């Protein structure tokens, strides 16, 4: 059990049966009366943000979250399917819960899935992924009038800016945290 004194940014707790992440916290002690704890929390399933004020002595349940290593299998309609490599158990996530991670998911990619009970509520990607460029404009040697980058589409449909020497069919390394080109795959 957490008390209001335990509240801080980044704390994960259960409120009304759903997991919440504290994203802002403020303590105030008026001249007379009890101390007040103002919080801003994000529902980890729906993304809804709550503003709540609590008084000293109130308690909260910690969020029972588990992170498991899983393998991305496939997408069907708006659902993404992942498999636990130890138990071979499969879980599905809605496109909204997957978020921007969908731009970097390729078959058999190992990811960490955040579970609340049996419900998958989040995906943590590796910091870098290798993806194949499927469409980009050709580079004209000696063309110095253009910029130092050009748009490219990778196999997942994600569009990013790459250096002009990158060609269709090449494998590139993308930083999943920023979504930017990192380097060309060697070999």
Curated annotation (Swiss-Prot):
Q: In which pathway does it act?
A: Protein biosynthesis; polypeptide chain elongation
Q: Which InterPro entries match?
A: Elong-fact-P_C, NA-bd_OB-fold, Rib_uL2_dom2, Transl_elong_fac_P/YeiP, Transl_elong_KOW-like, Transl_elong_P/YeiP_cen, Transl_elong_P/YeiP_CS, Transl_elongation_fac_P
Q: According to the lineage, what is the superkingdom?
A: Bacteria
What are its GO cellular component terms? cytoplasm
Q: Which UniProt keywords apply?
A: Cytoplasm, Elongation factor, Protein biosynthesis
Q: Where does the record say this protein resides?
A: Cytoplasm
Family annotation (NCBIfam families): efp, PRK00529.1
User: What is the official name of this protein in its record?
Assistant: Elongation factor P 2
């Amino acid at each position: 059990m957490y008390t209001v004194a335990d509240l801080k940014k980044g704390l994960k707790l259960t409120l009304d049966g759903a997991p919440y992440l504290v994203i802002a916290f403020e303590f105030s002690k008026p001249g007379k009366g009890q101390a007040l704890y103002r919080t801003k929390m994000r529902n980890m399933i729906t993304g809804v943000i709550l503003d709540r004020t609590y008084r000293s002595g109130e308690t909260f349940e910690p969020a029972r979250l588990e992170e498991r290593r899983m393998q991305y299998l496939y997408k069907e309609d708006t659902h993404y399917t992942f498999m636990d490599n130890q138990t071979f158990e499969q879980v599905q996530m809605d496109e909204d819960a997957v978020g921007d991670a969908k731009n970097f998911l390729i078959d058999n990619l190992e990811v960490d899935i955040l579970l609340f009970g049996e419900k998958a509520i989040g995906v943590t990607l590796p910091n870098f992924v290798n993806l194949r460029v499927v469409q980009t404009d050709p580079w004209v040697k000696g063309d110095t009038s253009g910029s130092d980058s050009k748009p490219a589409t990778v196999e997942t449909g994600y569009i990013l800016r790459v250096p002009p020497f990158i060609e269709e069919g090449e494998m590139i390394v993308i930083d999943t945290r920023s979504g930017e080109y990192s380097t060309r795959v060697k070999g």
